[in-house]
Amino acid sequence: IFAGWTIYAAMKHPYFSNPMIYLPLILMGIDKIYKKEKPYLFIWSVAVAGLSNFYFFYMLGIFMVLYAVFRYFEQFGVHSLKNVGKWLGVFAIYSIIAVLIAAVILLPVIFQVLGTDRFKAENYVPLFYDKVYYQKYLSCLIGENMIQWGVAGFSAVSMTGIFVLFAKKKKYRTLKTGFILINLFLLFPFAGHVLNGFSYVSNRWIWAYGMLMAYIFVKMYPELFNLSLKEKRTIFVFLMGYCVLALLPDAARTQRNLVAVLLLVLATFTVLSFGAVFTKRKNLMLMTGGFLIVGILFNMYYQYSYEKDYLS
């Protein structure tokens, strides 16, 4: 819902939406394993993902490992390093079982992909993107598309959730670290090179960013009703800083980006007004839902075109 990837990629290539289906199931499976519940959800989700598409299965594997690592330290802390080997063995066994289930289709596809000219080709990977990429980066998170399949286009209200997250001091450290890390992936071409199978630079993994944004917003939603005055001031500072940095470069001040930032300002001020201008939780719920719907419709309007196969 939050990701422009859903609107853009699923229209152009429907199977590009597959990883957005499998990733939540795999992550739920990881949580079940940590709770010492049955591993069936994890095994079958990984197996079906492997049967579906090797290209996205590779990316899913990377984010699966990252999530498992983050969840481990969140649940057990750094003082439980002695248990790392045990959990590595558990996940290795279940992952091997899943891969063996998918092997009848997965292995032939892997051999075919490894033999293609595209995979064997040597690709130039720059250290940084062009200057304009960084000038438009912040605004493009909720606005227009980036280069190299960097289709973010998140609903503006989800960025409000990010402000709330970082306003909460000494809480949600794992989510904060994950958010910073995934932005670093977008800022350096080498990450796009690695996540694209060490081929040319492409950010077709950005659907995982959308998953993180959605998860953060869901976690922050209850916090919207319990913000202290100090936290509201911090959120206001974040909002002002984002608006200035996002729209300061001339290249970033496009119509789509300006409207997206306007929606962000309205959504954030609505959240900050709760408890002062209005006090009914239902009103905030309705307005937050309204901004979410408007953000989705806004992205659809600017993303689709009546030309070029309905893609802008």
Feature map (PLM): residue ranges:
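Membrane-interface micro-motifs in multi-pass membrane enzymes
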Residues: 1-27, 34, 50-60, 145-158, ...
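Hydrophobic transmembrane alpha-helices
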Residues: 23-32, 49, 63-71, 214-222, ...
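Membrane-interface alpha helices of multi-pass inner-membrane proteins
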Residues: 29, 40-54, 97-100, 241-243
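Short hydrophobic alpha-helices at membrane interfaces in multi-pass membrane enzymes
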Residues: 33-48, 80-92, 229-241
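Contiguous transmembrane helix-bundle modules in multi-pass membrane proteins
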Residues: 37, 56, 177-186, 196, ...
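C-terminal TM-helix exit segments that contain a strictly Trp-centered aromatic cap at the helix terminus
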Residues: 60, 101-112, 298-306
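Perimembrane helix-loop-helix junctions
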Residues: 60-96, 266-273
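Periplasmic/ER-lumenal interhelical loops and adjacent helix-loop junctions
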Residues: 87-203, 250-256
